Amino acid sequence: MTRREIREHLFRMLFRKEFHEPTELEEQVLFYFDSLESITPEQQEYLNVRFDKINEKLGEIDTILANASSGWKLNRMGKVDLNIMRLATFEIRFDDEVPVKVAINEAIELAKKYGGDSSASFVNGILAKVID
């Protein structure tokens, strides 16, 4: 599984989380993995660990995004854009293995694929403030 595929899975897992109660999270993650055609137990474990790490830092991530997005409240942002930025912010601030430029570029690519017409530029603008 490539890093891009890992990011896409993590984005989908974060996005899915938005529509379920916290008590259903574990079950929803299992449903997500069941929906995938080919994923090894090792890949599933890796995704689980990364997903858990992101969730552990979610409060800090949201604070960083709120500070970077003056004029925008997180609860008013599109769920696609928000979760792409959460993933990228985790990589930028808490994952030393991912270069900042790569995290931003990958977030822009996810925004182009899953977001609306202005998502890529919106995500880019907010993430530029995250790295300042």
UniProtKB/Swiss-Prot annotation:
Signal peptide: none
Gene3D superfamilies registered for this protein in UniProt: NusB-like
Keyword annotations: RNA-binding, Transcription, Transcription antitermination, Transcription regulation
GO biological process: DNA-templated transcription termination; transcription antitermination
Disulfide bridge map: none
Entry's Gene Ontology molecular function annotations: RNA binding
GO CC aspect terms: cytosol
Keyword check for Lipoprotein: no
Pfam family, one: NusB
Family: Belongs to the NusB family.
Described function: Involved in transcription antitermination. Required for transcription of ribosomal RNA (rRNA) genes. Binds specifically to the boxA antiterminator sequence of the ribosomal RNA (rrn) operons.
Protein name as annotated: Transcription antitermination protein NusB
Gene: nusB
